[in-house]
Amino acid sequence: MSVCLTEEQKRKIEENRQRALARRAERLAAQQNTLKQTNNSHSTLFNIQKSTVEQGALFSGQRTNVTAACMAPLQQGSNNKYAFQKTSSGGSAASSLPGTAENKPQAGGNGPCDYKVPADPAQDFTSSKNLTGKYVAPKAHCVSSVPSFNDTPNPRQLNPACTTQEQEKPKNSSYSYSRPDSDTACDKFTAGPGPGPIRNTTAISKFYGANPGIKPALPVSNKTVSEVRDRGVTGSSVEAVPVKKASSSTRGRCVKHMEGRFRVEVGYSAELIALFKTIPSKAYDPATKMWNFGLEDYASLMSEVQRVQSVELKALEGMEGVQIAPPPTSGSGTNINALLAMCNNWQRPNATLRGRCILISRSRFEMEIGYHTEIIGLFKQMNTRNYDTKTRKWSFMLEDYQKLMESVRNIQQVEVEPLPRPVLQAFAPQFEKTTISLAEIEDVDLSHVDSKLIGNLMPFQRDGVNFAISREGRLLLADDMGLGKTIQAICIAAYYRKEWPLLVVAPSSVRFTWAEAFHRWLPSLNPESVNVIVTGRDSQSANLINIISFDLLGKMDKQIAANFKVIIIDESHFLKNVKTARCKAAMPLLKSAKRVMLLSGTPAMSRPAELYTQIAAVRPTFFPRFHDFGIRYCDAKQMPWGWDYSGSSNLNELKLLLEESIMIRRLKSEVLSQLPAKQRKMVVVAPEGITAKTKAALAAAAKEMAKGFKSKVQEKEALLLFYNRTAEAKIRSVLEYIIDLLESGREKFLVFAHHKLVLDNICEELGKKEVPYIRIDGNTSSADRQSLCHKFQFSEKSCVAVLSITAANMGLTLSSADLVVFAELFWNPGVLIQAEDRVHRIGQTSSVNIHYLVAKGTADDYLWPMIQEKIKVLGQAGLSEANFSETTESTDYFYKDPKQKTIYDLFQRSFSEQGAENDSDEALLLEACEEVDLGESTCGPTDYSGNACKRRKIDDYFAL
């Protein structure tokens, strides 16, 4: 079927063809100019048979077709000599002069390309002289059967002068090979990948293909001849000469793109594109189809390009003096590139026996493979071998890995999968000399960080900060819940304060908690520099610290500028699904940032696929392709509909890899001696989702209380209304926080609330999420209480205990949990402490975490400081623990105007120990709070629901 092209398409095709022809003509002209310059610079005479054509030489009387003209210019001097072996007929080689007997084709069928290098080059160098007294090099003619690079000799093997001169030349900062403008001719004809021993002397004559009648202009000393022989045959120059890339490699250059960035102009290379995708500051321009990068990544990019054998890049102009680290090698000379090269082309489709290598500890690896006599023989040759009779598997120290793999690869019918590249890179020092113990991380200088923050770090938290800085601020902090990931992250971020602005991405329920934490731990920080982004209309560019939720980040991905060099991701497991909007928005920011701190108490080790995005965010170079990660660690299987990555495999190796490179994880049981018995935390939540009616009621209640009241009854009515409205305002934030806890992997915890409306909403939400729960309130009988407690204590699945503060604060044992959440506050701190002790009882083996949810702009603003003050007074009297405030992560409330102070005093006076005349009075007040119908009530002081008897009791109470 013919394809009709438009005139525009035909025109573009013709233009492209003309450009291609023009480029080809330019290359040919450049090659001819280079050829002429080389001839002039070396004064070399080329003797070509008259029957030679312009594009290839054809010798008369022979059927050999020559397809290319290969030049072999040699530099003058006593140390620059080529020698050729005698012909098979016994005649000695002579100079390439017309009419000489030596220059005629031999009758034995040996053409001009059949000469060989003699075993002793001195034979020909000393037996013949050039009649002109000058050194004459032949123009080499290659036969049609072009030899491979493996069989192609390098002129450095035959010419020690080239090697010596190249060593004396300064290194080029571009680390790429291009034709130099120097007079070293042999540098211009490095065809092979590097010097090495001559495997086939016939290949040399085929490569040069010219009449070998070459004589030296000056005599050669025996010492020089021996050097030539030693270098050419033994290949000792490998250590002296840097390895050059093949002449067929893709060449490109680095050029300035814009201020602070450069681009790479190079042809297509799949390996190079994979490398580009691992650079943090990468950016692809679809219009020009070119990649550009930040100048801060120039050195690392050029260093990585050295590993790509098929690509050469010219240095960026003006960056020649930049120090570029060579490919990493171990101290004893073991090249990590040699280990990485084993990861390529290891598959053997015709293999009859297959196995794989697995890392089993930071010092040993295991080879899983079936029985094979040769393999067992190799295993027994390893000094560090160990055979496990239970698993019937062999293991070895990492220092034997290279030797064993090289030996196994020589067995053609055996295929062994090597260790992955990230494992080789992370444990590179271990392959040189294996050590069992971990290297100790030195303490970093934190003198420029706020002393208040440093003084509150526990020893294990200080170790976490040291680990993070040793990893250059890119890590996965996976400490167990309650071990202070927040304070560690703030300390790490403060260490890199000069690189701010800082972006914090957290669940919406804890955004304001992060803001309070920055104010508390960094007192030197201006409070105005912390910005919590609540809506998409909020600005984020003018502040040093910006805090945003995951959901809002997904909606504002185009508005969030990519200029954040330091990023903290709280609960980073929220990024487990790469297809979600939040993950798509976060990944580009994380890869372009210089410091990335991911915080997660549940790193999803049982499902490695959910961990991939976090690994890619911290170390993009580890696994550029998810499929490679899935094959190794997700037990990937190809199904009829595609690949299934839901499984897991080699989890121990993955854990070792992460702990060695990017992850630090401590469990409560490991650091229990450093933890207090109780750890209280104030979680600031935003009263979002409040209806206009409720918001107006809150404002009106606060306004009424600020006026002052004539009677005690009016005070209590106003406070009761304000307290009830607070419960309604907090419902949405409380539900979000509970769901975040469940998604974070929390299996068992207690939730205390006071209002029936709050308890009902929590139970309803748990039912929707199909989360098992128990509920104990004032309507639960004693028998049911015991059975529910037993169910919670011995449940192996996740379970939430929804409890009333006043009805379930005593007589219950729920020590199987170690987390307590107070959805609401209560004015009597004794009741709160009793509720805490439902978990902190005999049988509790862990530190207990207690979270108080406090909503700004509600009654919590006054209840929370009042509770702390009461506890302090009781502690001084010896009636309660005195360290309530000391073990609570909180911020003091400062009253900005007299009205707020008036409200606080009102709470203090009404709910103080002296304010309640007896317990029955307080019980009546509690009953009023529990029975009030928030959905139907208004701002009036008598908006209570319930039966007539209860209303009469309440009225009697307020009438006092």
From Swiss-Prot:
Q: Where is the composition biased (Polar residues)?
A: 145-165
Q: Which UniProt keywords apply?
A: Coiled coil, Hydrolase, Nucleus, Repeat
Enumerate the spans annotated as HARP domain.
246-317, 349-420
Domain Helicase ATP-binding: start-end pairs:
466-621
Q: Which GO terms describe its molecular function?
A: ATP binding; ATP-dependent DNA/DNA annealing activity; helicase activity; hydrolase activity
Question: Residue ranges for motif DESH box?
Answer: 570-573
Q: Binding positions for ATP?
A: D479, D480, M481, G482, L483, G484, K485, T486
Q: One GO BP annotation here?
A: regulation of transcription by RNA polymerase II
Q: Where is this motif: Nuclear localization signal?
A: 665-682
Q: Which residues cross the membrane?
A: none
Q: Name one GO cellular component term.
A: nucleus
InterPro entries according to UniProt: HARP_dom (IPR010003), Helicase_ATP-bd (IPR014001), Helicase_C-like (IPR001650), P-loop_NTPase (IPR027417), SNF2-like_sf (IPR038718), SNF2/RAD54-like_C (IPR049730), SNF2_N (IPR000330)
The reaction(s) catalysed by this protein are: ATP + H2O = ADP + phosphate + H(+)
Could you tell me the EC number(s) of this protein? 3.6.4.-
Q: Where is the Helicase C-terminal domain?
A: 737-890
**Pfam families the UniProt entry points to:** HARP, Helicase_C, SNF2-rel_dom
The protein's predominant localisation is nucleus
The record ties this protein, via PANTHER family, to: DNA ANNEALING HELICASE AND ENDONUCLEASE ZRANB3 FAMILY MEMBER (PTHR45766), SWI_SNF-RELATED MATRIX-ASSOCIATED ACTIN-DEPENDENT REGULATOR OF CHROMATIN SUBFAMILY A-LIKE PROTEIN 1 (PTHR45766:SF6)
The entry's protein name is SWI/SNF-related matrix-associated actin-dependent regulator of chromatin subfamily A-like protein 1
